[in-house]
């Protein structure tokens, strides 16, 4: 089997309209007015693979696009006999149990857990697996009646035994379900799978990660306060009055009046920094850069004042995969240890980010 044998019609959703049009133009295909171009290309997939230009466009996006990606580290339990463990794992993967070079029929209606249905070899000790996984139900309303149906995701999993990682292209929750299922069989070969921290090379810092990327720009953050502080109504009012006093000073520059007002407030902070008190009662803090702002979030005053007292939960980073390339946006999940490509990206872009996080 080859890669074209495991492509399904829904994969064509990953291609943008421009990419669909490009393939149609390369192959000189004429469409009827009401014809679905993605259906037409799927029906002519053999024709696409006979044309190198069309095939390159297809393969750059067919499993990419707008995707959540989560990586896992493949760990051999003992440092001795690693090659033997790897050989055992290869034999396991290249077996009927892993649907190697075959496609297993899946009954979607009865599907309750991730189900591996095909696996092929991409390169030396590198494989691509596909899983069907149920992800809730959807309701269809036709204006008079409604019906519910099970929603199924078709997930791509890359297994690279040389670089020792799993790359699962779906949300963190489903990726973990798939990884756990693989772990159940991998552990028999003295192999374990662990979450890979996408910021491990950057000491957990979104700012350092951003700086490692071409044209990196820290555009947005969602954070949580480090301490769960509570204020009385009286102390809350005193804090508000303190801010008013500071504002007044910037207006009249009267330092004596400023000192008198501060002493009159007599706020008892019990050693807690003023900025940290301002975060009392907050569950999360979201900061976002204006579109016309040239400098990113890490250069903004408010972020730099707060960052000592908050922990980033997630962040948006804009970047390029080359010095003068197109700008893409990713959402980095520090709790989920995953990356969501908010822009429609190619395999080249996913590879660029992969090399940064492994």
Features from the language model and the residues they span:
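Intrinsically disordered, low-complexity, charge-rich terminal extensions
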Residues: 1-358
């Amino acid at each position: 089997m080859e890669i074209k044998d495991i492509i399904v019609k829904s994969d064509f959703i990953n291609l943008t309209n421009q990419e669909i049009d490009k393939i149609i133009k390369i192959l000189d295909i004429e469409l009827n007015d009401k014809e679905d171009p993605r259906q037409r290309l799927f029906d002519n997939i053999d024709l696409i693979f006979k044309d190198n230009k069309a095939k390159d466009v297809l393969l750059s996006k067919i499993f990419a696009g707008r995707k959540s990606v989560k990586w896992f580290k493949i760990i051999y339990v003992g440092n001795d006999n690693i090659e033997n463990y790897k050989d055992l794992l290869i034999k396991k993967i290249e077996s009927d149990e892993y649907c190697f070079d075959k496609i297993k029929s899946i009954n979607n209606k009865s599907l309750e857990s991730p189900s591996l249905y095909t696996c092929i070899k991409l390169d030396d000790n590198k494989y691509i697996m596909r899983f069907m996984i149920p992800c809730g139900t959807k309701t269809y309303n036709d204006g008079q009646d409604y019906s519910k149906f099970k929603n199924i995701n078709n997930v791509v999993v890359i297994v690279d035994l040389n670089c020792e990682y799993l790359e699962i292209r779906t949300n963190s929750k489903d990726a973990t379900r798939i990884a756990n299922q693989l772990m159940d069989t991998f552990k028999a070969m003295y192999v374990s799978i662990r979450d890979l921290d996408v910021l491990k090379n950057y000491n957990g810092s979104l700012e350092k990660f951003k700086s490692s990327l071409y044209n990196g720009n820290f555009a947005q953050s969602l954070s949580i306060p480090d301490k769960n502080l509570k204020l009385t109504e009286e102390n809350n009012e005193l804090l508000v009055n303190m801010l008013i006093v500071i504002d007044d000073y910037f207006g009249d520059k009267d330092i004596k009046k400023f000192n008198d007002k501060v002493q009159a407030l007599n706020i008892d902070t019990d050693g807690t920094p003023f900025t940290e008190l301002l975060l009392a009662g907050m569950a999360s803090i979201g900061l976002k850069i204006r579109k016309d702002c040239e400098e990113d979030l890490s250069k903004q005053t408010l972020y730099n004042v707060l960052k000592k007292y908050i922990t980033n939960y997630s962040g948006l980073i804009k970047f390029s995969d080359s010095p003068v390339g197109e700008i893409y946006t990713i959402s980095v999940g520090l709790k989920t240890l995953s990356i969501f490509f908010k822009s429609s990206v190619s395999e080249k872009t996913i590879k660029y980010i992969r090399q940064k996080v492994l």
